[in-house]
């Protein structure tokens, strides 16, 4: 879904709309020129900070590349100024800009990746498991940085994650997907305290807890996961749902 929103994957059915000011984009029907303008507003933070950065480029050149590709600057001096500004916001200093990616830890590389994503001032950012490849000790630092950038720059994030503790920390609204279909969507606090869908309840019950009274309360889902290529009819979760009814197979 995140890749389709950025037109990095084909949209096989349905529509994706994006509003920016007075302009409304139909993402699936964009021309090449419209797509170029759209990508100034919608960007992606990759999951793996080790694979996402060109090892032959300095950090300065990595961050500046979107500005040059999208023709957002006229001179190198203008590009340098924008790079320094966004680097500072992502907690990178001038010395960092002169180095190559191999000199940095995973958390530092992810900050470089975030700076590259934000240098063209997008409004919408897809963060695809952006802390999953990092040590737990580093994850909190990156999450706090993303939250700070969201508040300071007015960003909207589509934060994709399998880690519900991370989701609870950073998201305002949560959508739970099963076999490619959204089964429940609600404000974060409401979804975590009063889940409605059986799949959401099963996910939340599997979160590790230090409370000994909760030991053994995780719901064990029976049966094999159906193929997303040929999903079940009705509610896609009904083949594994402990409370499924006949109507679930149809609706």
Predicted regions and their residues:
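Helix-to-loop junction immediately C-terminal to a conserved catalytic motif
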Residues: 6
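ABC ATPase NBD Q-loop/coupling interface
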Residues: 15-37, 75, 191
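Conserved ABC ATPase "signature" region
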Residues: 22, 68-71, 77-95, 204-205
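A short, proline-enriched helix->beta-strand linker immediately N-terminal to the Walker B motif
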Residues: 119-123
């Amino acid at each position: 879904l995140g890749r389709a929103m950025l037109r990095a994957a084909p949209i096989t059915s349905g529509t994706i709309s994006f509003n920016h000011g007075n302009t409304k984009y139909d993402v699936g029907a964009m021309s090449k020129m419209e797509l170029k303008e759209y990508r100034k507003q919608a960007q992606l933070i990759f999951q793996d900070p080790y694979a996402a950065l060109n090892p032959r480029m300095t950090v300065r050149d990595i961050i500046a590349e979107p500005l040059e590709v999208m023709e957002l600057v006229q001179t190198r001096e203008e590009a340098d100024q924008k790079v320094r500004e966004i680097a500072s916001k992502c907690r990178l200093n001038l010395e960092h800009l002169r180095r190559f990616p191999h000199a940095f830890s995973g958390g530092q590389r992810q900050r470089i990746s975030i700076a590259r994503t934000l240098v063209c001032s997008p409004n919408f950012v897809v963060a695809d498991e952006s802390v999953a490849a990092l040590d737990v000790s580093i994850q909190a630092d990156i999450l706090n940085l993303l939250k700070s950038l969201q508040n300071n720059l007015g960003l909207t994030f589509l934060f994709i994650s399998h880690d519900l503790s991370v989701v609870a920390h950073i998201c305002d609204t949560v959508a739970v997907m099963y076999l490619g279909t959204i089964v429940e969507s609600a404000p974060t606090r409401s979804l975590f305290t009063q889940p409605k869908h059986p799949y959401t309840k099963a996910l939340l019950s599997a979160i590790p807890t230090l409370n000994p009274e909760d030991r053994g309360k995780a719901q064990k889902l029976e049966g094999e996961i159906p193929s997303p290529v040929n999903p079940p009819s009705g509610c896609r979760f009904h083949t594994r749902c402990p409370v499924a009814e006949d109507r679930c197979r149809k609706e």
